[in-house]
């Protein structure tokens, strides 16, 4: 039982008509520690009990069993609970130290599978900074869901089909150099693609060539198939370098092409349900009752669209993974598309359509400017990660020039800084990226949290890594209590982040815990020889464990030394 549950349980004994869960939801955390650790507002009871909230608060407070609390006091319409710092703090520390790897875990998911569509770059194009958000938000959500006992399935739905590949093949036929492609695949292919698009203004026949090549690809022409497979293979090899740097694995790379032979079934099902209507030669589904535009399934030339392909993918994923939830971590600009996807599945009679969730996110800008991909102007993610690693290396050199594994730490700090900066922001907000700000060791940054963890590890090394087995642990003083209390809030933060698909809650939590620990460190002689030394070191160990765990949920490493 965590601290919030402890307070809710005490309230439930005097409010038996309300569940512990309902009471937990009503509890507030006072901003000022003088008002206690938890506050219970009584306004909502006034109508039912026909009494003023202040009177209700006083009457309830008199009935509450105060054992396990330092005190319970009334403040107007609120009942303020002060937890017993020494005993509750000791219990929190003991819980962390007993099983650090599983602290904060809970069985919210009951091993239910959750498919997560994330990253999904286009082959033969560089991964730009725009791909960072879907990739790291999706991965963090997967980690958080795993922590509450869901089974995440990371799906990289590659953009590996479409008329653009016909254009690329036409460009390669005209200007391609195999050796040049082998040397630098994605940038070279991107160069060809930009060239044919730029020159198509003066040479409209290039568009015709592109259509001809794509028609060959659709018809299974051996040369078109060979080029397509080669472009896909070299692109994926390049992407894997970035994914390895980010330390992200995928369970599936089934992209758009995988569903080429699975869309006819979708159209047949829609025909059987008599859902298709003709509109100017195209086939659509009327979604007026959902307040949505008609969903186009087949164009007048008989070709299918993204929605048809995504319907095929949705059916395949449900059959393959029997998911409890199916998430699509895609920019907010695609909200209408996923609303249509969900509505069409519902019209098809699939009750599991309510398991489909679009996880939108805001745009990313660089130094206050929008990032453009027109005419090849792409800010490449790999370049930004490498620049961040270099900057981290410089700062480590200044702070700790004798650090043994400086290159590895620089990579963990540099990459972690980029990931953390994205994830500390609420995902629906737009994010501005300024490299120099992102890699700072102070302020609301990833390196600040990593440095707090490394500081805790340094203290534990100096103390000879003591054993806490069998020790009676307590928490002494307000600053120590603020740290312990924050540690005790880890599980509820994880549960909320899982329910809201919001990794920023973990990012903000990690920053808050690091800040509380740094304040404690600044005002406490942790290694002083007295009867509280082991408890102080236990607090430091718990901070180290929980910061490492929180960073791991975000996909960020926690170096032991910096």
Swiss-Prot record:
<protein>
    <recommendedName>
        <fullName>Arginine--tRNA ligase</fullName>
        <ecNumber>6.1.1.19</ecNumber>
    </recommendedName>
</protein>
<keyword id="KW-0963">Cytoplasm</keyword>
<keyword id="KW-0547">Nucleotide-binding</keyword>
<comment type="similarity">
    <text>Belongs to the class-I aminoacyl-tRNA synthetase family.</text>
</comment>
<keyword id="KW-0030">Aminoacyl-tRNA synthetase</keyword>
<dbReference type="InterPro" id="IPR014729">
    <property type="entry name" value="Rossmann-like_a/b/a_fold"/>
</dbReference>
<dbReference type="InterPro" id="IPR008909">
    <property type="entry name" value="DALR_anticod-bd"/>
</dbReference>
<dbReference type="Pfam" id="PF05746">
    <property type="entry name" value="DALR_1"/>
</dbReference>
<keyword id="KW-0436">Ligase</keyword>
<dbReference type="GO" id="GO:0005524">
    <property type="term" value="F:ATP binding"/>
</dbReference>
<feature type="short sequence motif" description="'HIGH' region">
    <location>
        <begin position="121"/>
        <end position="131"/>
    </location>
</feature>
<keyword id="KW-0067">ATP-binding</keyword>
<comment type="subunit">
    <text>Monomer.</text>
</comment>
<dbReference type="GO" id="GO:0004814">
    <property type="term" value="F:arginine-tRNA ligase activity"/>
</dbReference>
<dbReference type="Pfam" id="PF03485">
    <property type="entry name" value="Arg_tRNA_synt_N"/>
</dbReference>
<dbReference type="GO" id="GO:0006420">
    <property type="term" value="P:arginyl-tRNA aminoacylation"/>
</dbReference>
<dbReference type="Pfam" id="PF00750">
    <property type="entry name" value="tRNA-synt_1d"/>
</dbReference>
<dbReference type="GO" id="GO:0005737">
    <property type="term" value="C:cytoplasm"/>
</dbReference>
<dbReference type="InterPro" id="IPR005148">
    <property type="entry name" value="Arg-tRNA-synth_N"/>
</dbReference>
<dbReference type="InterPro" id="IPR036695">
    <property type="entry name" value="Arg-tRNA-synth_N_sf"/>
</dbReference>
<dbReference type="InterPro" id="IPR001278">
    <property type="entry name" value="Arg-tRNA-ligase"/>
</dbReference>
<dbReference type="InterPro" id="IPR035684">
    <property type="entry name" value="ArgRS_core"/>
</dbReference>
<dbReference type="InterPro" id="IPR009080">
    <property type="entry name" value="tRNAsynth_Ia_anticodon-bd"/>
</dbReference>
<keyword id="KW-0648">Protein biosynthesis</keyword>
């Amino acid at each position: 039982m965590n601290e919030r549950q402890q307070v809710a349980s005490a309230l439930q004994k005097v409010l038996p008509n309300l569940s512990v869960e309902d009471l937990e939801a009503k509890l507030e955390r006072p901003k000022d520690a003088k008002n206690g650790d938890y506050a219970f507002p009584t306004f909502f009871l006034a109508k039912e009990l026909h009494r003023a909230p202040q009177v209700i608060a006083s009457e309830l407070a008199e009935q509450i069993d105060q054992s396990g609390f330092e005190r319970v006091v009334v403040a107007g319409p609120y009942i303020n609970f002060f937890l017993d710092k020494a005993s509750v703090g000791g219990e929190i520390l003991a819980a962390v130290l007993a099983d650090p790897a599983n602290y904060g875990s809970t069985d919210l998911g009951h091993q239910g599978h959750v498919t997560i569509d994330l990253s999904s770059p286009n082959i033969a194009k560089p991964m730009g900074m725009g791909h960072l958000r879907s990739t790291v938000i999706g991965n963090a959500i997967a980690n958080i869901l795993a922590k509450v006992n869901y089974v995440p399935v990371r799906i990289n739905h590659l953009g590996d089909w479409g008329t653009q590949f016909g254009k690329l093949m036409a460009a390669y036929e005209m200007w391609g150099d195999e050796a040049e492609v082998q040397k630098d695949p994605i940038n070279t292919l991107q160069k060809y693609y930009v060239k044919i698009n730029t020159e198509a203004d003066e040479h409209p026949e290039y568009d015709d060539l592109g259509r001809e090549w794509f028609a060959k690809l659709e018809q299974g022409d051996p040369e078109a198939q060979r080029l397509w497979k080669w472009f896909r293979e070299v692109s994926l090899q390049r992407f894997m370098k970035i994914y390895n740097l980010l330390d992200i694995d995928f369970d599936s790379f089934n992209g758009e092409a995988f569903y080429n032979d699975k869309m006819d079934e979708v159209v047949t099902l829609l025909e059987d349900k008599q859902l298709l209507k003709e509109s100017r030669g195209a086939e659509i589904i009327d979604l007026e009752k959902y307040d949505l535009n008609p969903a186009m399934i087949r164009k007048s030339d008989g070709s299918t669209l993204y929605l048809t392909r995504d319907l095929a993918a949705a059916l395949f994923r449900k059959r393959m993974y029997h998911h409890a939830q199916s998430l699509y971590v895609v920019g907010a600009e695609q909200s209408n598309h996923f609303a249509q996807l969900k509505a069409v599945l519902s019209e098809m009679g699939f009750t599991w359509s309510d398991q489909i969730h679009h996880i939108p996110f805001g745009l990313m800008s660089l130094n206050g400017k929008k990032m453009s991909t027109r005419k090849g102007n792409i800010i490449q993610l790999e370049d930004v990660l490498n620049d961040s690693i270099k900057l981290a290396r410089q700062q480590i050199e200044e702070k700790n020039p004798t650090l043994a594994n400086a290159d590895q730490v620089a990579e963990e700090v540099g990459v972690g800084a980029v990931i953390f900066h994205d994830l500390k922001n609420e995902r629906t907000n737009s994010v501005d990226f300024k490299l120099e700000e992102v890699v700072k060791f102070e302020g609301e940054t990833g390196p600040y949290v990593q440095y707090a963890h490394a500081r805790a590890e340094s203290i534990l090394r100096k103390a000879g890594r003591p054993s806490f087995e069998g020790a009676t642990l307590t928490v002494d003083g307000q600053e120590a209590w603020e740290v312990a209390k924050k540690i005790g809030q880890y599980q509820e933060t994880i549960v909320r982040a899982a329910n809201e698909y919001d990794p920023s809650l973990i990012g903000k939590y990690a920053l808050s815990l690091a800040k509380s620990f740094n304040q404690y460190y600044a005002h406490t002689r942790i290694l002083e020889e007295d009867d509280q030394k082991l408890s102080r070191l236990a607090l430091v160990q718990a901070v180290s464990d929980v910061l490492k765990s929180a960073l791991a949920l975000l996909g960020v490493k926690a170096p032991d030394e910096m």
